Swiss-Prot record:
Phosphate binds at residues 9, 44-45, 205, 231. Disulfide bonds: none annotated. SUPFAM superfamilies: HAD-like. One of its GO terms (molecular function) is magnesium ion binding. The keyword Hydrolase applies. Mg(2+) binds at residues 8, 10, 228-229. One of its GO terms (cellular component) is cytosol. This is Putative phosphatase MG125.
Length: 285
């Protein structure tokens, strides 16, 4: 039996068009119908602004809200929705020394840093590193949502740094440099051949799940999670039931309770149906 379902957004709940598709809506509706008390928690690397939009859309699908908690920035912030407004429950900002060291390394290797500021208003992103890539990112993508880094941004606090490289070979090299530089002091995750993400040591989805469970007096044995990438590993280790999407890293699949075998628009709904048919009302140990 489960009381909570933790969901990643990109590559999991959201389709390739960044929406909740009809098969997923139907499967989720059937799951909630089978257990009306079931709650959903969203856990994502996105910003609070982007995450909240999807939380609101998800809640609007049902007669009563199903999402009370969500974490964003890869677990650096946790929110609880009260009176239809998100209330911050914790946050982890990177130490200034970590930020400055990261920016220095990335600039040397001609990569681009996209740092997420602890801010509720735009601009909430700052750019550092390769100036040409930064210019294209600002003027063709984020526009008013981002600015170029200055020392005052350290006072605001930085929740997460996304690092981009055009060269996969260089990205792999810098990933190893960052891992060796920081050791276990921060989370350094390789998301793709061109993307690295850096967060505070305690800023992960596993911590978010555990924190929420203690706050709501829920057992981790009654929680299931679904994800598809490295930043889902921590929550897979915490929850009793974990389900990996078909294109997940092999190490994530190894620790998963089950894995989707679909790569089409049914890849997420297949896992929801599996949960509905097996563990949704199964007796807890």
């Amino acid at each position: 039996m489960i009381d909570l379902l933790g969901l990643d957004l990109d590559g999991t709940l959201l389709s390739k068009t960044k929406k909740i598709n009809n098969p997923s809506k139907l499967a989720l509706t059937n799951l909630i119908a089978k257990k009306p008390s079931l709650k959903v928690m969203i856990l994502t690397g996105r910003s609070v602004f982007s995450t909240l939009k999807h939380v609101e859309k998800l809640n609007s699908l049902f007669k009563k809200p199903i999402v009370d908690y969500f974490c964003c920035y890869g677990g650096a912030k946790l929110y609880q929705i009260e009176a239809n407004k998100p209330q911050e429950r914790y946050k982890f900002c990177l130490e200034n020394s970590v930020v400055e060291t990261t920016f220095s390394i990335i600039k040397k290797h001609r990569g681009l840093c996209l740092a997420y500021l602890d801010s509720y208003v735009s601009p909430y992103l700052c750019l550092a590193g390769n100036k040409l890539l930064g210019w294209f990112t600002k003027y063709f993508w984020y526009r008013k949502r981002c600015v170029f880094f200055n020392q005052n941004h350290l006072k605001q606090g930085i929740l997460k740094i996304s690092v981009y490289f055009l060269s996969a070979k260089r990205c792999k090299k810098v990933y190893e440099i960052l891992k060796n530089t920081f050791q276990e002091k921060v989370n350094v995750l390789s998301f793709s051949n061109n993307l690295i993400e850096i967060t505070h040591h305690d800023a992960n989805k596993g911590y978010a799940i555990e924190y929420m469970a203690k706050r709501e007096q829920l057992s981790l044995n009654r929680i299931a999670v679904i994800g598809d990438s490295w930043n889902d590993y921590a929550m897979f280790k915490k929850a009793k039931y974990s389900f990996a999407m078909s294109k997940s890293p092999s190490q994530l699949k190894l620790i998963a309770t089950n894995t989707s075998n679909k790569t089409n628009r049914y890849r997420f709904s297949t896992l929801l149906n599996l949960i509905s048919e097996t563990i949704i009302n199964q007796k807890a140990d």
